Design a protein with these regions (language model features):
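A conserved beta-strand-loop-helix scaffold within acyl/acetyltransferase catalytic domains
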Residues: 2-51, 55-66, 114-252
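Short, high-confidence coil segments that cap the C-terminus of an alpha-helix
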Residues: 41-43, 102-105, 217, 271-273
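Short, charged beta->alpha transition segments
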Residues: 64, 93-100, 130-131
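A short glycine/small-residue-enriched secondary-structure motif
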Residues: 63-79
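Anion (oxyanion) recognition and catalysis
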Residues: 101, 130, 165, 270, ...
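Short, well-ordered beta-to-alpha junction loops that form the rim of enzyme active sites
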Residues: 112-115, 280-281
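Aromatic (often tryptophan-rich) hydrophobic motifs at membrane interfaces
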Residues: 49, 58, 73, 79, ...
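Divalent metal-dependent hydrolysis catalytic cores, especially in the metallo-beta-lactamase
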Residues: 105-113
Length: 314
């Protein structure tokens, strides 16, 4: 018999310990990551118990009449004990739907965890949601490099990497608070110029998250004439490197500085990781593909994996 308990602060230690020993021990599900922006979202995370034993967690927030997994995270979905099997997640999903209906929820928006982030197979949730009539509402194209068997880069990309080296660009990992703020300022200038947008995180927030998770969050910057002209904020998971942010100013694009950053990241993590996820190249819930952006990512040897969102409407 599955019972649901809504997460509260007193459960933080239990939550975090469960994450560490789950099929998906991803640091961004740690409460110290999830709660850095708790003022922006009404948290409604859930804990699932089977005969008083915790078997699954579900990071969620509520907005109006929707339960969403989770708007403050790249993706969410059930985080399962390694002992959990299909029938248990079927039961958890049934209880989730009953819980949602009891709260007057009209829609569950479910951003499931892409399979490359699983340390053990963990798609019981997709099958369980299918049984309850869930439909795909969003498909976003992300470009992923197989680090153990990368595809060849074209000559043009290699020449840009060589040019950056000739121009004296040096890639360094930076750790200071001010470095993160400087990089996010660069990111915002680029986003504003090309997309009329700003970064999801502020520089202060990224510096805070780095201080909380220094082994998982890294800033690699291209330095040219003592200035950051390009860089990447990298999230490091068990078998995946995710390029959370990429930015390059006009000079960096001219001399291949960001190309060098990405090339060095590939070489650095190739011995220990399986995948490099360079992120999504879609807009408008996946309906618009930025062909220039995805082409650039593909030129490093990446190909498409998708991020899917499912919905159940009551």
């Amino acid at each position: 018999m599955i019972k649901i308990k809504q997460y509260s602060k007193e459960n933080e230690k239990v939550w975090d310990q469960f994450i560490e020993n789950s099929k998906n021990p991803l640091f961004m599900f740690n409460r110290k990551y999830m709660e850095y922006h708790e003022d922006r979202f009404q948290d409604n995370s859930l804990m699932f118990y089977d005969e008083n034993k915790l078997v699954a967690l579900l990071p969620m927030n509520v907005r109006n009449d929707k339960l969403i997994t989770h708007e403050g995270l790249t993706f969410g979905g059930f985080i399962e004990s390694t002992n959990v099997k299909q029938h248990t997640i079927n039961d958890c999903t049934s209880e989730l739907i009953s819980y949602a209906k009891g709260k007057g929820i009209k829609r569950i928006v479910y951003k499931h965890i892409p399979h490359m982030y699983h340390e053990q197979p963990s798609e019981e949730d997709i099958y369980a949601l299918f049984l309850h009539g869930a439909q795909i509402s969003k498909v976003e194209a992300a470009t992923v490099i197989n680090l153990r068997k990368p595809l060849k880069m074209p000559k043009g990309r290699k020449s840009q990497i060589s040019r950056a080296k000739r121009e004296g660009v040096v890639v360094k990992e930076l750790n200071d608070h001010d470095d993160y703020c400087e990089f996010i300022n660069l990111e915002n200038r680029v986003l504003s110029e090309h997309y009329g947008a700003t970064a999801t995180h502020t520089g202060e927030e990224m510096a805070l998250l780095h201080s909380r998770f220094p082994e998982h969050i890294h800033l690699y910057a291209a330095i040219y004439e003592y200035t950051i002209i390009a860089g990447a904020i990298v999230y490091e998971y068990g078998q995946v490197i995710h390029l959370q942010y990429l930015a390059a100013d006009d000079k960096a694009r001219e001399i291949g500085a960001l190309d060098l950053v990405i090339a060095e990241a590939i070489e650095k993590y190739r011995p220990t990781k399986l995948w490099l996820d360079s992120g999504k190249s879609t807009e408008d819930d996946g309906r618009f593909l930025n062909e220039g952006l995805i082409s650039q990512k593909e030129s490093f040897g990446g190909r498409t994996n998708v991020y899917e969102t499912l919905e159940i409407i009551f």
